[in-house]
Structure formats: structure tokens, C-alpha cells
């Protein structure tokens, strides 16, 4: 006779996506009827995000080092096509934002405010910051979550250990597996964490402050939805020659939803790693491409930079030609790739892009202030697009290289997981 599963067993073996949806709905209900109670449970969200941020650096370090150290000479990692997809997707996102902003121009009511941050003086400063992050102290890189530095040191250690004894390589492999199990445990608490995040955010900010920027938000979110559901599928189809939507929807569901509420690409790295494992992608590939994508794959950031820059341009009545618009797309794409090297991320790169049109810095910083006001939606959607695209492009490159039937593979994996969940229940 099969023993009746306990409540904890049902929680651990249940559908994570369904539990997250329940957490979202419960958070909305609690914040609507009892804001005070909602604020009191917001610590669950902060605790969850902190746990993800804590485990992400060490996860990336040991996985990358282990993958490279144990890599066979004939192994193909497919990193080059993935990086090309990252850059292509970011450039397409910026170009799409230019076109949408041209057909649906946005004007802003600027308000004077004091932003306690200093934007970079130019693209060279952004690149300079990234270069210094590469040679950061390894301990400081782990403590501060500097994933560029972590990748550099992990790769260096991995290459150095390729000549080590097999026992040393096996020990490193065992450590990476142990950290991965810890990550799986943390991710199982995503429903509770997202419940706290939703309840706390709605209770604290509400959406009243966003009503004055509905057109701006519509343009921003419209661009991001267009990239997620039209442009990315076209790119994936061009790479795999298979139906891209099973992969697209699964990544949006299992990566994008979590990223939307954590609002942190770094915190979502463990979630993406777990999803890549479910998709049965090559571990040597995704252990490097996912943390790299969290650093340079910034389609959402390029959209934010472009849309808000052109909103400032339209507000001031500045005319621009197609050549300047193309240049803005390139600058926004390059700047977005360096957004992780700037405190404040994509918003503080807006003055850099505004400089192309001669927009005064005072006006540019007022646009940045508006960005912070709408950040509860803008930043969430931006992170969801950025993070889910990391898995999408990694999977597309892997499927193309191995000539796997992408759509059939995703559907088969989902069917097997459903049967496994049903059997456990």
C-alpha cells in the first residue's frame, strides 16, 4: 500500500508553475484587502531574492570551472553562435524600439528631481568599467556578484585544472553537483517568495503613480512583447528551422515569470540553469552561456534606453534623420551590453544616448527620474525579457548544433514531466 504523501511532499513534488500562479493570485488578493498584512509578509520576497543572489555567484563559479576542467578536447560548447544570437537579439530590440517610437511618438511631462547617481560620460567609460570588472579580485567578485569577474576567474581556473589529476576534477564536479542541489531547493520556495514580492510591491506602491505614463508604458511593453513573441521566434526559427513557440512559451513561463518578480537577472541565473537542465541542454554550454547572457544579453535594456531617449527627443521637438536613428540603435545595443557595468543599469545609460541628439543633461536626468517612477513595471518586464531570452538563445544554438527537433523535444519533455508529476502525486 502506497503511503499518503505529506503536505511537504506534495509541495516539493507539485507543479512549480502552478504554485507560482497561486502565489501571484494570493499576493494580489492579500494586498487588495489588507495592505498592512501584505507589507508584513513582504520579507518572504526579500528573503527569496537574497537567497537566489547568494547562491548565484558560487553556482556560476563552480559550474564554469568544473565544466571547463572536465571538458573533453572534442567537446563543442556552441558559445560562438550563442554570443552572436545575444548581440543580434539586442540590436534587433533597439531597432524595433526605434521604429515603434517613430510610429507612436511619446511626449513626457518633465519634473525636476534630484537623482543620486552619476551617469557614465560616454561609451568608453562603460567599456572601461567592464574591463576592470574582468580583472577584479576573485573574492570580491564573488562577494559583490560581479559575474564578468566570476566568469573570467572560473574560466582561468578551469583551463588550469584541465591538466590536474582525475580525482581533483571529480571533486570539483561533485562540488558543482552539490551546489546545484542547493539551488534546486531554493527554487522550490519560489511560490512563497513571489507571493511576498507581489503582496509587498502592490501594498507599498500600488499603480496610481503609473497612470500618468500609460502611453510610455504601452510603447515600452509593446516593444518587449513584440520582441518576445515575434522577433525572438523568427530568430529561433532561422537558427533551428523548427516551430519556435513551444520553446518560447516554456522559457517565458518558467524563466520570465520568476524574473519578472525578482527583477534581477543575477538572481534568475539559478532558475535558468535549472530550466536548461530540464531541457537537457549541454551542461558545458549553458553553465557559461547563462551567466554570460545575464551580463551582455540585454534586449530589454536596449528597448528602455531607446524608447526613453526618443521620448525626450520628441518632447523637445528635436528632428532626427534615419542615419541618427540607426546610430541610436547601435549605441543603445552596445550600451545595453554594458548595462551590468553601470550602477542603476539601463536607466543611467539614457543620458549617454540622449547626447546623440543634443538633449541637455538636466532634461535627460528628468527622463531617468520618470524611468524610476515606472520602474515597478518597466524593470520587471525588462528583466523578464532579458533573462528568458538567455535560455531561448542557448537552447536554439544547442538544438541547431545537434540537429535536434526543437519543438518535438520540448513537447516530449513537457509530457514526460507531467507524467512524472502525476505519478509522484
From Swiss-Prot:
- Report one GO cellular component: plasma membrane
Is the keyword tRNA-binding assigned to this protein? no
Which Pfam family, just one, is annotated for this protein? SDF
Gene3D superfamilies assigned: Sodium:dicarboxylate symporter
Domain of life per record: Bacteria
Membrane topology term reads: Multi-pass membrane protein
Where does the sequence pass through the membrane?
11-31, 43-63, 91-111, 141-161, 182-202, 216-236, 290-310, 316-336, 363-383
Print the keywords alphabetically. Answer: Amino-acid transport, Cell inner membrane, Cell membrane, Membrane, Symport, Transmembrane, Transmembrane helix, Transport
What InterPro entries is this protein classified in?
Na-dicarboxylate_symporter (IPR001991), Na:dicarbo_symporter_sf (IPR036458), Ser_Thr_transp_SstT (IPR023025)
Catalyses: L-serine(in) + Na(+)(in) = L-serine(out) + Na(+)(out); L-threonine(in) + Na(+)(in) = L-threonine(out) + Na(+)(out)
Q: Name one GO molecular function term.
A: neutral L-amino acid:sodium symporter activity
Q: Which PANTHER family match?
A: PROTON/GLUTAMATE-ASPARTATE SYMPORTER, SERINE_THREONINE TRANSPORTER SSTT
Instruction: Quote the function comment for this protein.
Output: Involved in the import of serine and threonine into the cell, with the concomitant import of sodium (symport system).
* HAMAP family (UniProt xref): Ser_Thr_transp_SstT
| Record's protein name | Serine/threonine transporter SstT
Specify the species.
Psychromonas ingrahamii (strain DSM 17664 / CCUG 51855 / 37)
The gene coding this protein: sstT
